[in-house]
Amino acid sequence: DKYYFEIPESLFGREILVVNRISKAAAGMRAAGSFFGYGGDQIGQNVIRFEKGPNDKIFLRNISFAEYSKDSTSPMFTAVNNSNIQPIAASFDIKAFGKDSSGAVIDITDYIAGDNDVLNFNGGLKSSLRLSSVQSDKSYVVGVNSYPINIEIKTVKTYAQGAAPATTGNFGGGGSRGGGNLTMELNSSLVLLPKEPMQARYYDPRVGYFSVRYTDFDANPQGVKNISVVKRWRLEPKPEDMEKYKRGELVEPQKPIIFYI
């Protein structure tokens, strides 16, 4: 089977979150006492975007937010951008154009069936599990499903695993003691992110949130500053309830958190 993405003009340059998980884990993947290697475990996360390139190419860029400058009037803005060209993770030939001749159709069969850091294990985790490259003759695509704001890709991948060292840790490292093949079912979720980012909440050590850090070149005009923001759900009041929210009244969120069981 062949799998194609049709990318409309409106999606070029938009940021897409990619989350990769093990949906069905491999037998013999876990060392005794290991806390990693079960169905549902996350194995990678990226933010990507598609861009038009020269010679009828579509580029997939892997986006990093480690260093940041948003003030285009700042002398540091150009310097930061010149030092942070986002890597091209993949290149695709345009196979056809959309109905309006602006969108593009690309063949992603080999990319999703193969081995890469965007849709599979991140490099560090793959190394700690001692996994080699994907064995293509023992791997295949289960299916690709498209929804309004997300795409779900399910594959079965087979890796050769090297022999374990004398001692291994319990957190994501080590795997089984012996070598051999590991076959597992993986799921990749590609979710279109909103055009307008959510309001960041800065980290305070007095409040128990997980956090993520980046280097801000605008916060301190005499140097750089490491900024930490918390990881949280995007809970925002409805526009018509904003004044009530500011007065401290209890209001319903614009988009509530829903758990499916």
What positions do the PLM features span?
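Auxiliary tRNA-acceptor-end handling modules of aminoacyl-tRNA synthetases
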Residues: 1-261
